[in-house]
Amino acid sequence: MSSVTLVAKSKLPTPWGTFTLVGFQETGTGKDHAALVMGDITGDEPVLGRIHSECLTGDALFSLRCDCGFQLQAALENIAKAGRGVLLYVRQEGRGIGLLNKIRAYHLQDQGADTVEANVALGFAADMRDYTICADMLKQLEVKSLKLMTNNPRKMKAMESFGIPVAERVPLQEGRNPHNEFYLSTKANKLDHMFKK
């Protein structure tokens, strides 16, 4: 049984071209998630894709504390240039701890904690995201394999474990700045994210 149900589709014009916006609902929680699709993503050829976890602060409020908004824009640009691809927008804010806890974690980071220490101090694991829903979304979209835009090896392993082969990792290193340097270094050192030196 799938963890998500495809609920609705519409066109979504963006600065990079027109995507199909696909809405999904988690069967257990009712939480909604979205996919942006361009071109025909069915078939055997690997699809350029990104699994993007919701980041209100980076995606909508232009925060420089993270690289999320920069990665979101770059991923959509890359898909548009390719003419074919999918971006999953997964509602797992703050690596799964939610917006209010993310703000609490930011407060701890303001006092010197790194992103992992802040989550742990609040009683959470470093990363609480569940990638089962991502695999189920991709399967309902008939994606058979990915060229995954990510720096996170956990996303690649998760897709492989759920039967979505990752044919290629496409690095997505965007938006490094003085405000997120410590954050990105922590992701590399404690969460095994892959960044060029």
UniProtKB/Swiss-Prot annotation:
Keyword presence, Hydrolase: yes
Pathway assigned to this chain's UniProt record: Cofactor biosynthesis; riboflavin biosynthesis; 5-amino-6-(D-ribitylamino)uracil from GTP: step 1/4
Free-text cofactor note: Binds 1 zinc ion per subunit.
Residues at which Zn(2+) binds: C55, C66, C68
Keywords of this entry: GTP-binding, Hydrolase, Metal-binding, Nucleotide-binding, Riboflavin biosynthesis, Zinc
First-tier enzyme category under EC: hydrolase
Co-factor(s): Zn(2+)
GO molecular-function term, one example from the UniProt record: zinc ion binding
EC number in record: 3.5.4.25
Catalysed transformations (reactions): GTP + 4 H2O = 2,5-diamino-6-hydroxy-4-(5-phosphoribosylamino)-pyrimidine + formate + 2 phosphate + 3 H(+)
Keyword Cytoplasm annotated: no
Binding site for GTP: R50, I51, H52, S53, E54, Q71, E93, G94, R95, T115, T150, K155
GO CC field: cytosol
Active-site residues, Swiss-Prot/TrEMBL: D127, R129
GO BP annotation list: riboflavin biosynthetic process
Top-level lineage group: Bacteria
Functional summary from the UniProt entry: Catalyzes the conversion of GTP to 2,5-diamino-6-ribosylamino-4(3H)-pyrimidinone 5'-phosphate (DARP), formate and pyrophosphate.
Sequence similarity: Belongs to the GTP cyclohydrolase II family.
Protein name: GTP cyclohydrolase-2
Species annotation: Aeromonas hydrophila subsp. hydrophila (strain ATCC 7966 / DSM 30187 / BCRC 13018 / CCUG 14551 / JCM 1027 / KCTC 2358 / NCIMB 9240 / NCTC 8049)
